[in-house]
Amino acid sequence: AKNDIKTRFACSYLGIIWAFVNPVITIVVYWFVFQVGFRSSDIGNIPYILWFASGLIPWFFFSEAWNSATNSLTEYSFLVKKVVFKVHILPLVKVISNLFVHIFFVAFLVLFFIVYGIEPKIYWLQIIYYSFSMIMLVISLSYITATLVVFFRDLGQIMNIILQFGMWLTPIMWQIDMIPDRFMWLFKLNPMYYVVQ
């Protein structure tokens, strides 16, 4: 997993820093658009930037890990052709390499909550449970899609579209209270609904 991270950014001047710069810029841009542009207010007693980042950071991990793990067999096709190589570890390597970045952002987010004067509470330990559940979900989905993409290469592009729709259909930038009760069950079919909530 460590080697995968190095390889991904090997030809760039900033190297692994790009793994952190892109999500930060995305968060700042969305925050500016929604809070400054659309004047979104704080959610309860939680500043909007914290509420928003709490949903977007898990989504970053979910989408990046699933997308990269899906393409792992085609990306490392030179290894797949080796008979003695254990192919099944490739999607797992991609998930773990994305997990390193996710852990950094979760720690950074916790620090931000403390800086904003929000004291740690016992229920913050739920982060461990939901992170584990999300990792298991990504690994399960990745084994399915990584197998299918070998036979249907367009799946990688289709997944990009699905993940775009998924981000907007998950209550990350909007509150779930906006949805009428009769449609709530549809949104609860999305596993990431429970993580970002």
Question: Which residues does each PLM region occupy?
Answer:
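Hydrophobic transmembrane alpha-helices and immediately adjacent juxtamembrane helices
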Residues: 2-197
